[in-house]
């Protein structure tokens, strides 16, 4: 089945009881039991809810997993995945990993005895060099946030398996429409469903899936034990958003490429980070392992100090956190999404104060270009 069709008909696409084409919102906290220990598959909505279950089946279907899990946020899902590890374990993290993931690991999980080494995961030699006897997991973003680095998933997964490591991939930027890490050797895939999957800036959610039954059982335990589950209303919203993911991603990519090409030629821009440009260092790899390049891009201005006045002059591009909605968003990672990363470490990774990140929406491309141009006109 083609992905475009699977987005609509995958998972549980209708209600088994009534035949409703839209899975109903089961707004309930508990369920009647026939007798003690005998129920119809659901006993308490933290442990399971039919609306959430339909979403979980859908993400597993889209990513090629055996089971999916829906959480109250992307970070709640990532926390559950890292709960698979034990005190004393070591993890490899990307040097431009999302700031929230960095904060979770370095402010919370370290207190539980976990440690990490920050590396450029797009460089396989750095991965091999950083592996220690107690390394248990390799955590990847590809494309990465915010520098849009592309990591060779098949090669990394192969190295990880040789060393007995879990390969965990944040697939938020690419979405299942453009990339399926499990099919390339990864063990676990995580998503911020808040972003492209929801697509309308109206829901906060996290999704996890794996193609390993044993891992699925462990994640299911942590999902229930920790309790950061997604509610039925948000589960329904996310399923509705996913139905149009294909159409939206095509529009996001079309506009992003147009914007990237415009920026690459602009005299006030120093560098553009977009894997859909032939000038991107991993362009050929992106073409090989992805079916498209998504709608995220970043660029640096020639004068770092102009980033703030530039983004504050934009009108259609909304200055705000998050990404992946139908509307275009702009941010300065150094002061927003990645502000929790120490400045020296941030700059060493290439996240300068003058780096601007765009989540290119699905507006008319000419309006977006004109908005960018008028903002450029207001800086030196």
Swiss-Prot record:
CDD domains: CGS_like (cd00614). Optimum pH is 7.5. Optimum temperature is 45 degrees Celsius. CGS from H.pylori is an attractive target for antibiotics discovery since the four natural inhibitors alpha-lapachone, 9-hydroxy-alpha-lapachone, Paulownin, and Yangambin also display strong antibacterial activity in vitro, highly inhibiting the growth of H.pylori, whereas no antibacterial activity against E.coli in vitro. These inhibitors might thus be used as potential lead compounds for further research in the discovery of anti-H.pylori agents. The modification N6-(pyridoxal phosphate)lysine is found at residue 195. InterPro entries: Cys/Met-Metab_PyrdxlP-dep_enz, Cys_met_metab_PP, PyrdxlP-dep_Trfase, PyrdxlP-dep_Trfase_major, PyrdxlP-dep_Trfase_small. It catalyses: O-succinyl-L-homoserine + L-cysteine = L,L-cystathionine + succinate + H(+). One of its GO terms (molecular function) is cystathionine gamma-synthase activity. The keyword Electron transport does not apply. It is an enzyme of class 2 (transferase). Catalyzes the formation of L-cystathionine from O-succinyl-L-homoserine (OSHS) and L-cysteine, via a gamma-replacement reaction. In the absence of thiol, catalyzes gamma-elimination to form 2-oxobutanoate, succinate and ammonia. Belongs to the trans-sulfuration enzymes family. This is Cystathionine gamma-synthase. The gene is metB.
């Amino acid at each position: 089945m083609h992905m475009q069709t699977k987005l609509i008909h995958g998972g549980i696409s209708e209600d088994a009881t009534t035949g409703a084409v839209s899975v109903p919102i089961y707004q309930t906290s508990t369920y009647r039991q026939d007798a003690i220990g005998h129920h119809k598959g659901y006993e308490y909505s933290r442990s399971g809810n039919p609306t959430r279950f339909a979403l979980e089946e859908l993400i597993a279907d889209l990513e090629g997993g055996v089971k999916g899990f829906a959480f109250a946020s992307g970070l709640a899902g990532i926390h559950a995945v890292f709960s698979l590890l034990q005190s004393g374990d070591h993890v490899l993290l990307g040097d431009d990993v999302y700031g929230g993931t960095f904060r979770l690991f370095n402010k919370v999980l370290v207190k539980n005895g976990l440690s990490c080494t920050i590396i450029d995961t797009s460089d396989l030699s750095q991965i091999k060099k950083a592996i220690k006897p107690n390394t248990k997991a390799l955590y990847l973003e590809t494309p990465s946030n915010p520098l849009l680095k592309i990591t060779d998933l098949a090669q990394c997964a192969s190295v990880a398996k040789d060393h007995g490591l879990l390969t965990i991939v944040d697939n938020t930027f690419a979405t299942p429409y453009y990339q399926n890490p499990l099919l390339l050797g990864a063990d676990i895939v995580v998503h911020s469903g808040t972003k492209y999957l929801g697509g309308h800036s109206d829901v906060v959610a996290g999704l996890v899936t794996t193609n390993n039954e044993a891992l699925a059982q462990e994640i299911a335990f942590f999902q229930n034990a920790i309790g950061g589950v997604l509610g039925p209303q948000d589960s329904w919203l996310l399923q509705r958003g996913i139905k149009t993911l294909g159409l939206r991603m095509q529009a996001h990519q079309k506009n992003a490429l147009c914007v990237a090409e415009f920026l690459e030629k602009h005299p006030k821009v120093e560098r553009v980070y977009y894997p859909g440009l032939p000038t991107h260092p991993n362009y050929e790899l992106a073409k090989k392992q992805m079916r498209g390049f998504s709608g995220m891009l970043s660029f640096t201005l020639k004068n770092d100090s102009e980033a703030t006045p530039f983004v504050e002059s934009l009108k259609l591009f909304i200055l705000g956190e998050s990404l992946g909605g139908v509307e275009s968003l702009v941010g300065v990672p150094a002061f927003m999404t990645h502000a929790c990363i120490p400045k020296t470490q941030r700059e060493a990774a290439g996240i300068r104060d003058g780096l601007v990140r765009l989540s290119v929406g699905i507006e008319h491309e000419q309006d977006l270009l004109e908005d960018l141009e008028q903002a450029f006109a207001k800086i030196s």
